[in-house]
Amino acid sequence: MRLGKPKGGISRSASQGKAYESKRKTARQRQKWGVAIRFDSGLSRRRRNVDEKPYKCAKCSKSFSQSSTLFQHKKIHTGKKSHKCADCGKSFFQSSNLIQHRRIHTGEKPYKCDECGERFKQSSNLIQHQRIHTGEKPYCCDECGRCFSQSSHLIQHQRTHTGEKPYQCEECDKCFSQSSHLRQHMKVHKEKKPHKRGKNARVKTHPVSWKRGKGRKAVAGIRQVKGATSGLFKKKK
């Protein structure tokens, strides 16, 4: 006995075939934009869980977890910034970047910490802040196992292992591993520059410690410790 077709006039196998062909067509369209995808749509949730990034840019090989993110990324290569701020005229590739930028003008801070009530302009800043309360440190060093709450702190720490010093002083070419260390160092050059109060005023080259009341003891102490740099604190003739 022959089995009849299900209601609707289309067999189940034919329906599955059409769905498969539809996915293949979508895949071919996305591959034109440099996208690599999988046909199984049920994998999308699992991809997010394991940080899988199947959508790849053909221009720079950067990968993304969502096709919409790749589409926005490709605007970087085209150079088109279609989202413009009405207040200052600055343009952005993505509407989300414009929304974040607008908060500079409006002062809006929509992201609130439930623990302490502090508010933030960006959700990423709130996530970083919440780790103060939770103690979470997801960024770990492969060399020594030390963990940090922010990726920027891990990057700074890793320079203790690599010896990298990317911040260079323009005055003396001395290099530092952290920008804060460079800023602290730059004060040395500012202290050395002469400050004149009048036409016949004496030139002062003493460091800040002299002004703070630490006097000659502090300067003498620096001369003893530094040795070779003692000449920096001598008066000009």
UniProtKB/Swiss-Prot annotation:
PANTHER family: GENE, 32687-RELATED, ZINC FINGER PROTEIN
Keyword match RNA-binding: no
GO terms classed as biological process: odontogenesis; regulation of DNA-templated transcription
Modification N6-acetyllysine occurs at: 18, 23
Function: Binds DNA through the consensus sequence 5'-CAATG-3'. May be involved in transcriptional regulation and may play a role in tooth formation.
PROSITE patterns per record: ZINC_FINGER_C2H2_1 (PS00028), ZINC_FINGER_C2H2_2 (PS50157)
Record protein name field: Zinc finger protein 22
Keywords: Acetylation, DNA-binding, Metal-binding, Nucleus, Repeat, Transcription, Transcription regulation, Zinc, Zinc-finger
One GO location term (cellular component): nucleoplasm
